[in-house]
Regions:
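An aromatic- and glycine-enriched ligand-binding surface/loop that stacks and positions planar moieties
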Residues: 15, 34-36, 40, 63, ...
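Conserved, well-structured interaction surfaces
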Residues: 1-33, 49-85
Length: 184
């Protein structure tokens, strides 16, 4: 898409949204498989597919990519608060979640029942020395979410009532919702 055919702010938003979904896809893959090949450039078709056989990246490199992508794109979303599209809040929530996963994996590296399955290449497992940095990134993203007004649904004094109402409240009335699928 050229910048002349669409407003610059919309173009930045759509590009940020595409990068968000790419990072989200990498998050789902790294949780499932550990390190996966990280491809950020468009690949061209060629007769010999050998150059397309990219080796797995370290698990930590995938988490680092997700976190850095969310930091890079968060301002491109502007002040949009649409709960059914990627926004700055959704980017910070994904950063928070990815950093928490990576931080707890690293923190528990030496206690893991699957430690013997970790590959020496780093494709699986994250060394414990990285735990503090990931957990700090998680807390920073959480603080940004709170500063944007996201919080637990607390309309009633009774916690059980709040829990029940959180699922039936209109999306615009629920400060817990960051990124959701809308139903009529």
């Amino acid at each position: 898409v050229s910048a002349g055919s669409i407003a610059v702010d919309k173009l930045k938003y759509f590009q940020a949204e595409a990068r968000y979904f790419r990072a989200y896809t990498y998050f789902k893959m790294v949780v499932q498989y550990g390190g996966v090949p990280l491809v950020t450039e468009v690949t061209e078709y060629m007769e010999d597919p050998t150059p397309l056989a990219v080796p797995r990246n370290k698990e930590s490199e995938i988490y680092d990519f997700i976190i850095s992508e969310m930091d890079a794109i968060k301002e491109d979303f502007g002040t949009a608060r649409v709960k059914t599209r990627a926004t700055k809040g959704a980017a910070m929530a994904l950063k928070c979640r990815a950093a928490l996963y990576a931080g707890t994996l690293a923190y528990n590296y030496d206690k893991s029942a699957t430690k013997t399955l970790n590959l020496s290449s780093g494709a699986t497992g994250i060394e414990r020395s990285k735990a503090e940095g990931y957990l700090k990134a998680c807390l920073d993203a959480c603080a940004e979410l709170e500063a944007m007004g996201y919080q637990l649904y607390q309309k009633q004094a009774d916690l059980a009532t709040n829990c029940a109402e959180a699922f039936i409240a209109k999306p615009e009335d629920n400060p817990e919702l960051i990124f959701c699928k809308a139903y009529d």
